[in-house]
Regions:
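An acidic/histidine-cluster motif and surrounding catalytic segment
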Residues: 145
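Signature of the catalytic double-stranded beta-helix
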Residues: 1-46
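Catalytic core of non-heme Fe(II) oxygenases with the double-stranded beta-helix
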Residues: 31-118, 128, 136-138, 148-152
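Short beta-strand-plus-loop segments that form exposed binding edges in beta-rich domains
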Residues: 131
Length: 153
């Protein structure tokens, strides 16, 4: 599945004007995230990678399986108008995801089956509690990181 999703990551990198001739991107650290009823993931970052990706495989039908929250840890947004750094670094994240909540440095992303979210690995992120009341309430996602290798000249 990562091989099928990785071309999307490469397109995002091109849109960010990354030089893919000098820098090769590789998919690493692939894992499955299963959030059962009442489970959640605490705030964290992914060190030693440049992009983090999550692809939604299954969500509860009542859509209460938990949201992905991406937070820019730099508190300058409290004093200045919101720059487009989150949008630019996440392949037009604003139009892909929808509205941003009232906290200008935080995005709330509602999962959808088949949706992939790509964001800079240094951004703090977490998953809110799975509050689904369904019998089959698991929220399942595939996650992976992307690293950069310098190409030999």
């Amino acid at each position: 599945l990562c091989q099928e999703l990785f071309p999307i990551v490469q397109e995002i990198s091109k849109s960010l004007k990354w030089d893919l001739e000098k820098n090769e991107l590789n998919c690493v650290d692939i894992w499955t995230v299963i959030n059962k009823k009442n489970s959640f993931n605490t705030s964290h970052i992914h060190k030693n990678s440049i992009l983090s990706c999550v692809y939604y495989l299954k969500i509860p039908k009542d859509k209460k399986g938990g949201n992905l929250i991406i937070k820019d840890p730099r508190n300058v947004w409290e004093f200045f108008p919101r720059p487009t750094v989150l949008e630019d670094c996440s392949y037009n994240l604003k139009s892909t995801i929808g509205s941003v909540n009232h906290n200008p440095n935080e995005l709330v992303i509602k999962p959808e089956v088949g949706k992939m979210i790509v964001f800079p690995s240094w951004l703090e992120h977490k998953v809110t509690q799975n509050l689904s009341e369904e019998k089959d309430s698991d929220r399942i996602a595939l996650a992976f990181n992307v690293i950069e290798n310098k190409c030999q000249q």
